[in-house]
Amino acid sequence: MFGKLLTKVFGSRNDRTLKGLQKVVNKINALEADYEKLTDEQLKAKTAEFRERLAAGASLDSIMAEAFATVREASKRVFEMRHFDVQLLGGMVLDSNRIAEMRTGEGKTLTATLPAYLNALTGKGVHVITVNDYLARRDAENNRPLFEFLGLTVGINVAGLSQQAKKDAYNADITYGTNNEFGFDYLRDNMAFSPQERVQRPLHYALIDEVDSILIDEARTPLIISGAAEDSSELYIKINTLIPNLIRQDKEDSEEYVGEGDYSIDEKAKQVHFTERGQEKVENLLIERGMLAEGDSLYSAANISLLHHVNAALRAHTLFERDVDYIVQDGEVIIVDEHTGRTMPGRRWSEGLHQAVEAKEGVRIQNENQTLASITFQNYFRQYEKLAGMTGTADTEAFEFQHIYGLDTVVVPTNRPMVRKDMADLVYLTANEKYQAIIKDIKDCRERGQPVLVGTVSIEQSELLARLMVKEKIPHQVLNAKFHEKEAEIVAQAGRTGAVTIATNMAGRGTDIVLGGNWNMEIEALENPTAEQKAKIKADWQERHDAVVAAGGLHILGTERHESRRIDNQLRGRAGRQGDAGSSRFYLSMEDSLMRIFASDRVSGMMKKLGMEEGEAIEHPWVSRAIENAQRKVEARNFDIRKQLLEFDDVANDQRQVVYAQRNELMDAESIEDTIKNIQDDVISAVIDQYIPPQSVEELWDVPGLEQRLQQEFMLKLPIQEWLDKEDDLHEETLRERIITSWSDAYKAKEEMVGAPVLRQFEKAVMLQTLDGLWKEHLAAMDHLRQGIHLRGYAQKNPKQEYKRESFELFQQLLSTLKHDVISVLSKVQVQAQSDVEEMEARRREEDAKIQRDYQHAAAEALVGGDDGSDEMMAHTPMIRDGDKVGRNDPCPCGSGRKYKQCHGKLS
């Protein structure tokens, strides 16, 4: 109450922010008359003038008003479009590391030109990031004339470009592209073998369109570059035949499980678990098929791989539904994005789930993949010096943007008042009653000439509605993942008189629905249209537009509430753009997923008290509030999952940053001779310590073992026992020095034989290849650790703390093994000439060419520890050498010259 009173008196935080920015808008408006008088050449010269001022020490804020005024004037001349004041406000929000919520149709694409131009003046590059290639190309080509008029270059970064084309795109002042491609390029750059192979510049300013889709919906999806692992397709096929023999355990309204079953499904958590009976049944079936030894347990350490396959098959059959979660097209399983309804060709679920779904559908099973590099969008985008985003729906997720990314959300007012009428939800008892009511509403709208957009949550639902409309002889268009190519055309004409369009989630469609249809697309369809043809098309459109407005504008009809209020708001936001008339309503039933899982008890109780009859709907603010509360619960749960994922990934991210920084230093260095010298002493000393323990008596020394190890691993054939027998004054320290000196002498002899330049190049190649191989193994070990870490909770241990501790131990092993393996390889390999190094490089490039790039969907539970009954024995551990660890005061293995505790040891 008191808070509301304060807001009334002082205004909300959002109002105060906008009030402060309005002063700059007034400055820009004051400059408009002067800028209109400038010639084209004088206006273009402003870019060079701004760059000179920045070079002389001026800040971006000090030139913002003039820069925005320049872009506004250039836009008037190039596009005949003038930025509204609200677009100037949006541009300022985007320049200040914030998120601008701008409603659909308010011109986000034109708004983005303001901060993009301003930040491009620094010469460090601006990345404008969209959700798909079509939008990236469209926005780049649409805005190119404006930026080129002002003397800036524009690049497009999409999949399939050559290395040089990518370099050119990144070297442009402003680069348009998709979030996936920017993330993949970052990973590929950190797998490069020479500075020339890198394409990205340091990450400066990212401006993300549909920011909620990329930073929130995609936050649980890591980008993964992977190579094919061993083929186990036969095992997937065999295990797939087991699952139909299993029975689901029933549950009653009380949520208590009753009856005997083999597995239970937790719909809220999207998890499936074997019951004790199910576990026994699966083990017996496996024994019958000769896949498990008699008396053996599926949960024993030796059968972890088998358990992994069984769990994947069970999840594929019980949690993933055809035409909802995926479609089968041309013999391939293609994922459907639950948030946008789009198909995602090339993406695959990880953890063997995709292969299990392929076995279930009887299509060709592709190999499992081994992770070579990965990063989450959360950690990729947090690396940018400046980050901003825009969307039509951000306010519901404002807390998450602030908490995870440190980005405040500012709601930018619309240019014209919003007059859309949002009606209360109608709730029916059954889905059949709901669909009948929807058909009736559509018929009513068509009678008065009002266009209708029907939003569905799945392809299956859109096809069911389409069949009902065919039966009722209602002409309609279907827009779902299966009809991707026609998308822009269908959306463009969805606002025509009486048009009916069925669409799976409209998020990120990128094309506005114009009342009366899109007349620009009609003109573009003609070859060299005359002025008369253009005028006629415009006049016809105006007539249709007026008729649609008179009929009530676009009517949005939702067939089910989504888990997220934001995606419901995106659907609603398709109507009422730029002050147009419009309306929206959601039709629900007690059989809908959200209602059944989260809101059923309370709403069912209301319906029973009211004595609902068949075909009757309940419409009450209490019901809408109960549904909204259910959505809040789901949103809070999803936020917790994303937050937990980030906490786990932050551990890996610290290590990733260290390894990638190390690689870049290695690549950029002329020579790593000093690094090799620093680590050789550590490695040889560590091996000596294992056979001659420090400060120990001679009786405890294993001299024959040391001689053998030095010869096997470092090609050092030394008569250590002979030295000790002949020289009484030879003690532990002097012996250590002599062995290390012997290695140095042998290495110097190798250098004299092949030449210093060849050996220096070989050292770099060996260090990089060894680091990459160990990093790949380390990622696999981290994956296994993460999958089983949740079980530590049963032992009263904090899984996060355990994960941090064990992952750091794994990282220490990585650094230790890196030192050892590099010195061992350099000792053993005989380099004859430059051609040997070139041959090694050629082999490495051949291997690189075999790597397939996969964008994998890792289910959240796979990332933060699944519930598959696996345990710590699952963790793959690299080769461990006793006593071969890095001491806190030892030189850091990265070769920086600093002590380990002051360098990479800080990770602890």
Swiss-Prot record:
InterPro entries in the record: Helicase_ATP-bd, Helicase_C-like, P-loop_NTPase, SEC_C_motif, SecA, SecA_CS, SecA_DEAD, SecA_motor_DEAD
Disulphide bonds in the chain: none
Required co-factors: Zn(2+)
Comp. bias (Basic residues): 898-908
Cofactor binding summary note: May bind 1 zinc ion per subunit.
Any one of the GO CC terms: cell envelope Sec protein transport complex
EC number: 7.4.2.8
Localization per record: Cell inner membrane; Cytoplasm
Top enzyme category: translocase
UniProt-annotated stretches for the region Disordered: 865-908
Membrane topology: Peripheral membrane protein
Compositionally biased intervals (Basic and acidic residues): 879-888
Binding residues for ATP: Q87, G105, E106, G107, K108, T109, D512
Gene Ontology biological process terms from the UniProt entry: intracellular protein transmembrane transport; protein import; protein targeting; protein transport by the Sec complex
Listed GO MF terms: ATP binding; metal ion binding; protein-exporting ATPase activity
Domain of life: Bacteria
Residues binding Zn(2+): C892, C894, C903, H904
Record key words, sorted: ATP-binding, Cell inner membrane, Cell membrane, Cytoplasm, Membrane, Metal-binding, Nucleotide-binding, Protein transport, Translocase, Translocation, Transport, Zinc
Family indicated by similarity: Belongs to the SecA family.
Its job: Part of the Sec protein translocase complex. Interacts with the SecYEG preprotein conducting channel. Has a central role in coupling the hydrolysis of ATP to the transfer of proteins into and across the cell membrane, serving both as a receptor for the preprotein-SecB complex and as an ATP-driven molecular motor driving the stepwise translocation of polypeptide chains across the membrane.
Protein name in UniProt: Protein translocase subunit SecA
Organism: Shewanella sp. (strain MR-7)
